[in-house]
């Protein structure tokens, strides 16, 4: 399947969508195909999905009921220049990605408004029985990782399967608090 599409003038779109397969998903993913009936075939699919499945956005609404949903975020949040940082196996497994690690990996490439995608060679499909076990060797994020993104005015951050974003509350909460609260919401008056 082609995932890169040329737009002209040197611009391209790269589709990062992970396919959803109800047979292999570990979280709620049910697709019910049916024909509405009548003389003309009219097929539809009823979907019963959890919001944290496949390619998804951690939107402000996920963090606070009073904050914007994905539908309220500007589409431009998810479009633009992107930097892919693949640490491969250059960092020890289960290491928190530090500001120094990101500085070294990006070496001045990051610009204000960029999208940052972080990955490593320690891949593991998320949300499986192996998540957060000894088999899970992925790199980790925390408040320091998030603060680096905010300090460098990253507008959107994404992760490959080589980075764990839900290893423990002590890391997850600060990461979400800093990125979601500071990147997507306005301070209260």
Regions found by a protein language model. Name each.
Residues 1-40:
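Generic N-terminal segment detector
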Residues 16, 56, 85, 116, ...:
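Divalent metal-coordination and catalytic microenvironments
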Residues 47-64, 161:
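Histidine-centered catalytic micro-motifs
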Residues 59-98:
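A glycine-rich, hydrophobic loop/mini-helix early in the fold
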Residues 87-129:
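Glycine- and Gly-Pro-enriched alpha-helical subdomains that act as flexible
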Residues 167-177:
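Histidine/acidic-residue-rich catalytic or RNA/ligand-binding cores of hydrolases
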Residues 184-189:
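Conserved small/polar residues in nucleotide/adenosyl-binding loops
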């Amino acid at each position: 399947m082609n995932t890169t599409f040329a737009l002209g003038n040197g611009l391209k779109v790269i589709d990062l969508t992970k396919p959803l397969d109800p047979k292999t998903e570990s979280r709620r993913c049910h697709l019910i195909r049916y024909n509405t009936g009548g003389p003309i075939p009219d097929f539809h699919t009823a979907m019963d999905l959890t919001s944290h499945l496949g390619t998804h956005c951690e939107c402000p609404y996920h963090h606070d009921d009073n904050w914007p949903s994905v539908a309220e975020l500007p589409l431009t949040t998810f479009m633009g220049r992107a930097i892919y940082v693949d640490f491969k196996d250059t960092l020890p497994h289960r290491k928190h990605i530090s500001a120094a690690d990101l500085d070294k990996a990006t070496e001045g490439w990051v610009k204000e408004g960029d999208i940052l995608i972080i990955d490593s060679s320690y891949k593991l499909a998320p949300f499986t029985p192996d998540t957060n076990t000894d088999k899970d060797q992925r790199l980790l994020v925390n408040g320091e990782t998030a603060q680096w993104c905010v300090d460098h005015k990253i507008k959107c951050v994404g992760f490959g399967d080589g980075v764990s974003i839900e290893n423990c509350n002590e890391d997850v909460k600060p990461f979400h608090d800093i990125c979601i609260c500071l990147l997507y919401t306005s301070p209260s008056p």
